[in-house]
Amino acid sequence: MSLHLVPVRDRDAVRTVRLRHRRTPRGRVFAVAGADDDGRVRTVAVAHRPTAGLLDDGTTLEVTFADVGTGAPVEDSPLYTACRRAAESLGYTRLVTYARDDESAARARRAGWRASARRRARPGEGPVVVSLWQAP
């Protein structure tokens, strides 16, 4: 399924991300969505201040992606590219995202992002190891 970019209201993007990740991104800067040919939103990306304090240097943004949950396969690498371009045009020099090790990071790979670090599981979140991915 191919997607095209559509604007999304901040509150709608946050609600979608909260349903998937159970956490609201803080310090939101922008959001963008991907819709199918029928105009239905399939995936959302929210760019915000990094959750890791060491990355919160004023020049880095973190992007959280969330599928709407329709069950259909989604090709959202255009969202990765759009977020990178938007962040660059706003003056940010680094863009990162996290991918759980039990999930595929093929979308990030197809968009040219690369894994730069692995993070151990956080206390209270179960045995979830994540990889830090960085935009080119």
Could you say what each language-model-derived stretch is?
Residues 35-37, 48-127, 132-135:
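Acyl-donor binding region in acyl/amide transferases
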Residues 28-45:
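Conserved beta-hairpin
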Residues 1-29, 33:
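Short amphipathic alpha-helix that is part of the acyltransferase structural core
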